[in-house]
């Protein structure tokens, strides 16, 4: 399915499923799936809560990656077509 294709795509680059990049990739896939679900089911508040939790987890991982390795962070942002973190 979709998850397996993304896993195989990521395994070509690196074999570590616990890496920050892989976790952000899997969270992004979950976010896209939940977003399409919520377009059909607008009043599904439990899914909205789950979406917010996943967004927060992804945001924390991206903040960690941007602090540790800015180059890998930029590559991942461009690869996944997501916006950069807001800096204060």
From Swiss-Prot:
SMART domains according to UniProt: Ribosomal_S15
Signal sequence bounds: none
Assigned GO CC terms: chloroplast; ribonucleoprotein complex; ribosome
Subcellular location field: Plastid, Chloroplast
InterPro entries: Ribosomal_uS15, Ribosomal_uS15_bac-type, uS15_NS1_RNA-bd_sf
Keywords, ordered alphabetically: Chloroplast, Plastid, Ribonucleoprotein, Ribosomal protein
Any Pfam family: Ribosomal_S15
GO terms, molecular function: structural constituent of ribosome
GO biological process terms held by the UniProt record: translation
Primary localization class, coarse: plastid
Annotated family: Belongs to the universal ribosomal protein uS15 family.
HAMAP family on file: Ribosomal_uS15_B
Subunit structure, as described in the record: Part of the 30S ribosomal subunit.
Entry protein name: Small ribosomal subunit protein uS15c
Phylogenetic classification of the source organism: Eukaryota, Viridiplantae, Streptophyta, Embryophyta, Tracheophyta
């Amino acid at each position: 399915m979709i998850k397996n294709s993304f896993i195989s795509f990521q395994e070509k680059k690196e074999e570590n499923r616990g890496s920050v990049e892989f976790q952000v990739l899997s969270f992004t896939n979950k976010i896209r799936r939940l977003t399409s679900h919520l377009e059909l089911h607008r009043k599904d508040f439990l899914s909205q809560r789950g979406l917010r939790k996943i967004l927060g987890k992804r945001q924390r991982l991206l903040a960690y990656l941007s602090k540790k390795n800015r180059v890998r962070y930029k590559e991942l942002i461009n690869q996944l077509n997501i916006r950069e973190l807001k800096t204060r």
